[in-house]
Curated annotation (Swiss-Prot):
Its EC number is 3.1.13.1. This is Ribonuclease R. 3'-5' exoribonuclease that releases 5'-nucleoside monophosphates and is involved in maturation of structured RNAs. Keywords: Cytoplasm, Exonuclease, Hydrolase, Nuclease, RNA-binding. InterPro entries: CSD, NA-bd_OB-fold, RNase_B_OB_dom, RNase_II/R, RNase_II/R_CS, RNase_II/RNase_R, RNase_R, RNR_Ribonuclease. Residues 651-692 are annotated as: Disordered. Residues 670-692 have a biased composition (Basic residues). One of its GO terms (biological process) is mRNA catabolic process. Residues 563-648 form the S1 motif domain. It catalyses: Exonucleolytic cleavage in the 3'- to 5'-direction to yield nucleoside 5'-phosphates. Gene3D superfamilies: Nucleic acid-binding proteins (2.40.50.140).
C-alpha cells in the first residue's frame, strides 16, 4: 500500500523525485548539502544553492526535489521541497540595530549571516547593540519566503558580544550541546572505585609488570591508550596497544550508556572539553594514569622485522602504566636530546613506526600535511596566541600504532561474521579529482595518468610538495576533492588509508563507536544488529555537529584575534596565496594565520577581476592558484563575524612565469624520481601482500 502511494506521489511531477535526508548548511557561504536517508538508493550528497533552501536550516530533516535527469548524473543539484522537522529548537542572534524597546534587527548565522531578521524582545530590560539572544526556531511554511517572515521570538538574554566569556554559552546553545550530566549519570559513575579493578583481576591477564606507558599532549587528562614493545625468540616485534576498558564500567542500557549514546563523542574547544563520560571515569578510573592499576583491552600484534603482521592476540587485562610521557619528551628522546630510562624502547618504537610509514607509502596511502593551530585564551577568554601545530615523530609513532590496532580489530570482528561499525572513506568522485588535477597543473605540478591513480596522488603530495611553500594549499585542495569519512555497517574500505578493513577502537573514553566495538569483541550479543544501524548514523551525524561547533567557536575567537591585530597594527601586510578567482571575487589562504579569506570583485584592482567564469587554463598567470599576493586587514565586525581584506599590489614581485617554470621543472624531476620509486614500491607491495 505504502509503495503504491509513493509511486503515485512521484508521478504527479514526472520531472523530479523527492528525496528525504538531513541538510547541512555551510556556515559562511550559505549553500547546503542533503545527505539522503537511503544511501543505497541515492549514494551521493545533493547540492542545494543558498537561493533554493526555502527557509530550511542546518540540521533540518527535509525533502529535496531532485530532477530525474540528475538521479545518476554528475551535478546532483536540488531544491528544498519541504522541511519535515527542524534540527534545532533554538537559534542565537546578535542585535545589530534597535527599532524600538521591544523590537530589534538581529544577525542569525544559522539562517543568514548576511540578511538581518526582526526579533521581538522580552520586556523589562534595556538592550543595546551587540546583545546576544536565544531565539525560538521559526516553524517552516510552504512558499517560504513569499512574504517577510514574522519576527523571531526571544527566549533568553545571553550577554553582550563585547564579553568574550559569552562565546562558549552561545556555542553550546546554538548547537544544543549539554555540558552538565544528569544526576543519575553522575551517581552511577561515582559508584565505581579502585576496588573494582582489584576485583576484576581474577578474570583478566595480569600485565602489571609489563613496561607500558602513555604518550599524549602535556595538557591531556584522559589517557585512552598505552603502548608496549617486546620481541619473540626469533626477534620479531611484539607491539602492544592497551586501550582503556570503558565497556567494563559503561554497560548496555545503563544511565551512563544512554547518556554516552546521546553525546556520541567528546567535543574539544580551546582550553575546554565537553566529555562524553563524567570525569569520575574519563579523567580518573578509565584514564591510564601512571603507577596505578587500570583495566584495559590489550592487542598484541607480532610483526616481522620488515613490518608485516604474522599474528595477533586480543585479551582483557590489568595494566600499570609506568610513565606518562608527553610528545615533546618523546621527540627529545628520538632526537637524542634527552636521556630517559625508556629511551631504548622509544627509539625502537620510532624505528618500527618508520617501517609502518614506509609500508603505507608503498601501498599508495596519501599522507597529508594540513595546516592546523592551537589557540590560547586568557582568563577573560580572549585569544592571546595562535600557535601552529606540527606533526612530529612522536605524533607519527602513536598514529601508526593506533592505525595498526584499529585495522586488526576491524579484520578480527568482521571475520567472526559479526555486523560491526566500520570507519569508511569512499573513493572521491572522478569529477572532483579532475578539478584537483587541473588545480595542481595550474600551480605547475604534474600528475602522471595511470590505471590506478592513487600512487600518483601520494607521490605528488609527498615528493613534489615536500617543503614547498604551496604545500598547505595543494594538500587542502586534495582534501576538498575527497569524500568525508563516516561510520557504516557496510564495509566499503578506507580510501585515504588504502585499507580494506578499518574501524575505531582506540578511543572509547571519547567516542561511542569505539565503546560499541569493545562490546562486540567480548559480548557481541549485547549489541542488537538493528540498533547498531541507528548508532552508526547518530555517531556520523553528531561527529559533524561537533566539528561545526568546534569550528564556530574558533571562528569567533579568530575574529577577536584579528580585530586586535587590526586595532594594534592596522598597516600590517600578510603574505597570502590565491586559491580561486571567479566573477564574484578572489579567495586566498594566509598560512601564517591558518585562515582563508575572500575579497569581492567590487573591491579588487582591475587586473584581478574577471567578468566570466574561466577555466584554469584560460586564467592569466597572475590569477592562477598558488600565486603569492599581499593582503591587509580592512575591517573586522564582531557582530556578524565578517572579516574584510584589501589586496595590496606589490611593487616588487618576482615574475610568475619564472616561478611557474621552476615549479614545472621541480615537478618533472619529482615525476622521474617517483616513477622509479613507485616501480620498486609496487613490486615490493605485491611480494608482501600475503603478510596479513
Amino acid at each position: 500500500m505504502g509503495k503504491a502511494k509513493n509511486k503515485k506521489k512521484v508521478l504527479k511531477n514526472k520531472q523530479q523525485v523527492l528525496v528525504p535526508g538531513i541538510l547541512f548548511v555551510h556556515p559562511k557561504k550559505g549553500f547546503g548539502f542533503v545527505s539522503p536517508d537511503q544511501p543505497d538508493l541515492y549514494p551521493f550528497d545533493i547540492f542545494v544553492p543558498a537561493s533554493d533552501l526555502k527557509g530550511a536550516l542546518d540540521g533540518d530533516h527535509v525533502l529535496v526535489a531532485l530532477p530525474f535527469s540528475q538521479r545518476g548524473g554528475e551535478k546532483r543539484k536540488g531544491v528544498i521541497h519541504k522541511v519535515l522537522s527542524r534540527g534545532k529548537t533554538v537559534l542565537v542572534g546578535t542585535i545589530i540595530s534597535l527599532i524600538s524597546p521591544t523590537l530589534a534587527m538581529v544577525c542569525v548565522n544559522a539562517i543568514s549571516p548576511e540578511v538581518p531578521l526582526k526579533a521581538e524582545l522580552l520586556p523589562k530590560r534595556t538592550y543595546k547593540i551587540g546583545d546576544r539572544l536565544l531565539l525560538k526556531t521559526p516553524g517552516w511554511k510552504e512558499n517560504y519566503p513569499s512574504k517577510e517572515p514574522p519576527p523571531l521570538a526571544m527566549l533568553e538574554f545571553m550577554g553582550n558580544i563585547s564579553n568574550a566569556k559569552t562565546d562558549f554559552p552561545v556555542i553550546k546553545a546554538e548547537f544544543s550541546i549539554t555540558e552538565e550530566f544528569p544526576e543519575a549519570v553522575v551517581q552511577e559513575a561515582s559508584q565505581f572505585l579502585q576496588k573494582h579493578v582489584t576485583q576484576a583481576l581474577h578474570s583478566r591477564k595480569d600485565l602489571r609488570d609489563l613496561l607500558c606507558f602513555t604518550i599524549d599532549s602535556a595538557s591531556a587528562k584522559d589517557f585512552d591508550d598505552a603502548v608496549s614493545l617486546t620481541y619473540d625468540h626469533e626477534g620479531n616485534y611484539i607491539l602492544g596497544v592497551h586501550i582503556a576498558d570503558v565497556s567494563h564500567y559503561v554497560t548496555p542500557n545503563s544511565a551512563l550508556d544512554q547518556e554516552a549514546a546521546k553525546r556520541c563523542n567528546s567535543i574539544y574547544f580551546p582550553g575546554k572539553v565537553i566529555p562524553m563520560l563524567p570525569s569520575a571515569l574519563s579523567d580518573n578510573l578509565c584514564s591510564l594514569k601512571p603507577n596505578v592499576d587500570r583495566l584495559a583491552v590489550s592487542v598484541f600484534m607480532t610483526f616481522s622485522k620488515e613490518g608485516f603482521l604474522s599474528d595477533y592476540r586480543i585479551l582483557r587485562s590489568v595494566i600499570r602504566s609506568k610513565y606518562r610521557m608527553t610528545y615533546d619528551e618523546v621527540d627529545e628522546i628520538i632526537e637524542k636530546k634527552l636521556a630517559h630510562p625508556i629511551s631504548k624502547t622509544i627509539l625502537e618504537m620510532a624505528e618500527l613506526s618508520r617501517i609502518f610509514s614506509d609500508i603505507r607509502e608503498q601501498r599508495g596511502c596519501t599522507r597529508l600535511v594540513l595546516p592546523s593551530f592551537t589557540m590560547s585564551l586568557d582568563n577573560l577568554q580572549e585569544p592571546v596566541a595562535l600557535v601552529e601545530n606540527k606533526q612530529t615523530a612522536a605524533h607519527k609513532l602513536i598514529e601508526e600504532f593506533m592505525l595498526k590496532a584499529n585495522e586488526v580489530i576491524a579484520y578480527h570482528i568482521s571475520h567472526q561474521g559479526i555486523t560491526m561499525p566500520f570507519r569508511i572513506h569512499e573513493p572521491p568522485n572522478e569529477e572532483n579529482l579532475l578539478l584537483f588535477r587541473e588545480t595542481a597543473k595550474a600551480m605547475g605540478f604534474t600528475i602522471t595518468q595511470t590505471p590506478t591513480q592513487e600512487p600518483d596522488y601520494q607521490y605528488l603530495l609527498q615528493e613534489t610538495s615536500a617543503g614547498h611553500p604551496l604545500e598547505p594549499i595543494l594538500h587542502s585542495q586534495f582534501v576538498r576533492s575527497m569524500k568525508t569519512a563516516s561510520y557504516s555497517t557496510e564495509n566499503k574500505g578506507h580510501y585515504g588509508l588504502c585499507l580494506d578493513y578499518y574501524t575505531h577502537f582506540t578511543s572509547p573514553i571519547r567516542r561511542y563507536v569505539d565503546l560499541i566495538v569493545h562490546r562486540l569483541l567480548f559480548h557481541p550479543l549485547s549489541v542488537e544488529e538493528g540498533h547498531l544501524e541507528q548508532i552508526v548514523r547518530a555517531c556520523s551525524s553528531q561527529e559533524r555537529v561537533a566539528a561545526k561547533a568546534e569550528g564556530a567557536f574558533i571562528n569567533i575567537k579568530k575574529a577577536r584575534f584579528l580585530k586586535k591585530f587590526l586595532d594594534e597594527q592596522p598597516a600590517t601586510l600578510y603574505k597570502a596565496f590565491i586559491i580561486t578567482v571567479s566573477p564574484e571575487g578572489l579567495s586566498f589562504v594566509l598560512p601564517e594565520l591558518c585562515h582563508e579569506g575572500f575579497i569581492p570583485a567590487a573591491k579588487l584592482p582591475k587586473k584581478y577581476v574577471i567578468k566570466t567564469k574561466l577555466g584554469l587554463e584560460e586564467l592569466p598567470e597572475h590569477l592562477l592558484p598558488g600565486i603569492p599576493i599581499s593582503v591587509q586587514l580592512a575591517s573586522v565586525t564582531l557582530l556578524t563575524q565578517a572579516i574584510e581584506w584589501t589586496l595590496i599590489e606589490s611593487k616588487e614581485r618576482s615574475s610568475s612565469k619564472k616561478k611557474k617554470a621552476k615549479a614545472k621543472s621541480n615537478a618533472t624531476q619529482v615525476k622521474k624520481k617517483s616513477s622509479s620509486k613507485k616501480k620498486k614500491a609496487v613490486s615490493k607491495a605485491k611480494k608482501n601482500r600475503g603478510g596479513k
